[in-house]
UniProtKB/Swiss-Prot annotation:
GO cellular component, one term: cytoplasm
Species per Swiss-Prot/TrEMBL record: Phytoplasma mali (strain AT)
PANTHER family: 50S RIBOSOMAL PROTEIN L21, LARGE RIBOSOMAL SUBUNIT PROTEIN BL21M
Keywords of the record: Ribonucleoprotein, Ribosomal protein, RNA-binding, rRNA-binding
InterPro entries: bL21-like (IPR028909), bL21-like_sf (IPR036164), Ribosomal_bL21 (IPR001787), Ribosomal_bL21_CS (IPR018258)
Entry superkingdom: Bacteria
Name of this protein: Large ribosomal subunit protein bL21
Function summary: This protein binds to 23S rRNA in the presence of protein L20.
Family: Belongs to the bacterial ribosomal protein bL21 family.
Keyword rRNA-binding: yes
UniProt record, GO biological process: translation
Organism classification: Bacteria, Bacillati, Mycoplasmatota, Mollicutes, Acholeplasmatales
Amino acid sequence: MFAIIKNGSKQFRVFEGQEIFVEKISLMEKSNYEFKEILAIGGKNNILGQPFVSGAKVQAQIIKHGRAKKIIVFKYKSKKKYRCKQGHRQNYTKLLITKIIA
């Protein structure tokens, strides 16, 4: 069985036992988190939400918080000696999907 969940502006297709990386969630490690915005449930009988599936939820456990690899943003204007270099590291949360309730 799988579910398609919405977290912020992103959608994830998840299975039980799967680990996913999402935008930072402000909860402690080893605590439980519950997704309530379920767009679809798949398996033996498929359920599509309009826009969400009523009564469905996905339970997950927070494994760890971290920061992604640094990306470099470099802007310049040719022939004008304008150079701007900036780095950015995005915060993330690693989740373990424990249960899908349809």
